[in-house]
């Protein structure tokens, strides 16, 4: 617990660089599975993590720092999965500063599949627990509104990806 920061993430300056910007957000990620060497339940697995890049940018909301982290998972036979995380760090919210309003892109026409899901506090907490994600913006309403300055809990980017994959699985049950 002594290595966890106020926001619920590991403190910066250990594995992650000592970034001076306090707000951390998921900006994207990628997964690559090695079809010839799939992970199997019960196998011993080793994870090797490296920082691939650190890039400074200035955006419409101010200073930004993008960190790309790669995690390589392997078993006795070699590499099984490569996971990349794109993390963005931002300046702290200023008192009275309104959080940006999310913009929903217009739908392009008739959707082949759809499913309405309204994430609630319990779903966000459970997904945080399932993925060992201690970032308080996903489950601590007081923290996310009073410290981070957002209007409410933040839905995990990977949860959205998981729900999209589940929609495809439900819509194409016989696809591989």
Where are these regions (language model features)?
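Catalytic strand-loop segment that frames the active site of acyl-thioester-processing enzymes
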Residues: 1, 87-155, 169
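Catalytic-loop motifs flanking and including active-site residues across diverse enzymes
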Residues: 156-164
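Hydrophobic, proline/glycine-rich low-complexity stretches
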Residues: 1-44, 172
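A conserved acidic, glycine/proline-rich C-terminal tail/linker
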Residues: 165-176
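Histidine-centered active-site/metal-ligand motif
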Residues: 22, 26, 138, 156
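N-terminal hydrophobic or amphipathic segments with adjacent small-residue motifs
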Residues: 22-23, 47, 143, 151
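HotDog/MaoC-like acyl-thioester-processing domains
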Residues: 26-119
């Amino acid at each position: 617990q002594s290595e966890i920061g106020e926001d619920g993430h590991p403190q910066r300056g250990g594995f992650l660089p000592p970034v001076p910007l306090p707000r951390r957000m998921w900006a994207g990620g990628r997964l690559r599975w090695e079809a010839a060497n799939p992970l199997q339940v019960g196998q011993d697995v080793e994870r090797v993590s490296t920082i691939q890049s650190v890039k400074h940018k200035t955006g419409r909301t101010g200073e930004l720092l993008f960190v790309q982290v790669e995690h390589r998972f392997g078993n006795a036979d070699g590499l099984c999965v490569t996971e990349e995380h794109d993390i963005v760090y931002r300046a702290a919210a200023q008192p009275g500063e309104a959080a940006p309003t999310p913009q929903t892109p217009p739908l392009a026409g008739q959707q082949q599949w759809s499913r309405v899901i309204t994430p609630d506090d319990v779903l966000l907490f459970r997904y945080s627990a399932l993925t060992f994600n201690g970032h308080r913006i996903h489950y601590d309403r007081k923290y996310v509104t009073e410290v981070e300055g957002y209007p409410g809990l933040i839905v995990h980017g990977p949860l959205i990806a998981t729900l999209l994959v589940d929609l495809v699985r439900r819509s194409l049950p016989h696809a591989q």
